[in-house]
C-alpha cells in the first residue's frame, strides 16, 4: 500500500483522496499497491505525446503482466473535459481528475514541467524522484529500465558501455532471438554475412525530404562501391512508428533492413547519439564504429564521395583537394546556368541573363511563403537589401522558392525587390545540394569572382545588417572586432524585468534566439545559463546604452588630439 507520507502527499488535494480510471471509477490513493509510480504529463493535442503514449501503454501492460509493482498516473494538459475523456479512454492506468485543475497546476509547478510528454518516476513510499527522464528511458529501454532507480539506470549505462567496448555487427543489428536482416524482397539474410565488411546504418523516416534526397544519393554511392569491389553493405534503420510506412520506404531501397517489428530504431538512435537526419553510421570490418555520421561527407562530395571511402584521414585529404580544385573553378554561371536555363526572373517577369550578374555579390535566398520563419525574416532582408543597394550597385539577391504552388510563389515574390528562379526550376535542386541547404530561410553569399564567400550569410546579416556586406571572412572578422570593442562599454552583469529570477551575464557566444524580441542574435548575449535565457544587448540595455558602448569604442579607436596635433591613442 502507498504510504500516506509518500505518493498520497504528492497526488491528494483538499477534499479529494482518489484518482480515476477511464471507466470513471474512483480509486483511493491509499489503495495503490505499486512501489514505483510514474506521473505522465501529456495531452491529446501534442503529436509527440500521441507518439509516445502507445509505447508507454505497451511497457505498462508488459510490466503489469509480469507482476511488477508499477503504476502510472496521467496528469492532463488537455484544453477541455471532452479532449481529456477521449485521450484517457485509451489509457489502462489512473488519472488526476481533469476537474482538479489546481492539483494539475501544482504538479506541473512542483516537477518543473516545461514540455510534454514528460514522465516523472517516483518511489511510491517516500515520494523520492527516481528520474525525470522517464520518456527517454521507456523509449530506449522499454521494460528493461524498470524499476527506474538510479542503480538500474547506472546498470543500463554500464551494459551500454560494455556493449560498445565489445561491439560486433551481431550485437548492433541482432537480438537474442533474431540473427538475420531482411532484403527488400522479404528474404532473410544472416547477419553473419556482414562480418568482415564495412556496414553503413542509414536512419530513415518515410517521406522526410532530406532523407529521401540522401537515400537517392546513397543508392548511387552504394552501387559505385559495389562496382569497384568494395565490401560494403547498407542497413536501413527505420524511425517510423508505423510498420506500413516503414515497409513503403524500404521497398525502393537496394539494401537490407532491420525488421520493423523489432522496434530498434530509437534504441540505435540513442546508442549512436543521433543528432539529426540524414545520418549514416559507418561500422568497420571488425564491427567497431568508425564514424557516427558520414552522410554529410557523401552529401557534400556527391558523385566523387566514393573516392574517399572509407573516409580515413588520408582519403579525406584526397576529397578535400578535389573539392578545393572544384571550388577554385566555380563561377556564377557554373552555378546558375544549366543548358538553356541561363536566366533569372525580374519583377515584371522578364528574363534577366545570368551573364548580367557576373561581377556582382549575389545572395541566394532559399525561402517559401508557407514557412513562418521565412515570412518573419523577409521584412528584415528587404530593409537590409535596400540599404546595401543604396551604396553598392554591384549586389543582388535571387529568390529560390520551395513554395508548393504558383499562387503562393507569386504572392511571396511580389513582396521582394530582387530577382528569382522560376518555381520548380531544376537549378533549385542543384543549388540546394551544392550548398547542403537543410532548412529555410537560408542565405548563401557568392562573391564578385563567382566563388562562395559564405554558406551562411543569414547569421551575419541578422547580426550586423547591411554592414556585413560583402560577407567575406575579412569583413565579418572586422565586424566581430567592432562588436567586441563595443562590449567593453557594457555592464558585465545586470537584472532585467523580463527575467527577474537571476542576474543576466554578458556572454560571448555564437548564434542564439533572443527571448526579448524573438529574433536571432550572435556574438554577445546577456544570458542566464541556469534558465537558458538570452537577451540581445540592445534588448537588455536599450538602444542608448548600447550606443554608449559603441561611442566609447569609437573614442578609443579615434586619434587623440591635443595642441592641434592628432596622434594615435
From Swiss-Prot:
Composition-biased stretches (Low complexity): 560-569
Reaction catalysis annotation: [protein]-dithiol + NAD(+) = [protein]-disulfide + NADH + H(+); [protein]-dithiol + NADP(+) = [protein]-disulfide + NADPH + H(+)
PROSITE patterns hit by this protein: THIOREDOXIN_1, THIOREDOXIN_2
UniProt xrefs under InterPro entries: C1-like_sf (IPR046349), DC1 (IPR004146), Nucleoredoxin-like (IPR052259), Thioredoxin-like_fold (IPR012336), Thioredoxin-like_sf (IPR036249), Thioredoxin_CS (IPR017937), Thioredoxin_domain (IPR013766), TryX_NRX_thioredoxin_dom (IPR045870)
Thioredoxin domain residues: 1-158, 171-315, 321-488
Region (Disordered): 544-569
Superkingdom assignment: Eukaryota
An annotated Gene Ontology molecular function: thioredoxin-disulfide reductase (NADPH) activity
EC number: 1.8.1.8
UniProt entry tagged with the keyword Protein biosynthesis: no
Enzymatic class: oxidoreductase
Alphabetical UniProt keywords: NAD, Oxidoreductase, Repeat
Family: Belongs to the nucleoredoxin family.
Job description of the protein: Probable thiol-disulfide oxidoreductase that may participate in various redox reactions.
The protein, known as: Probable nucleoredoxin 1-1
Organism: Oryza sativa subsp. japonica (Rice)
Lineage of producing organism: Eukaryota, Viridiplantae, Streptophyta, Embryophyta, Tracheophyta
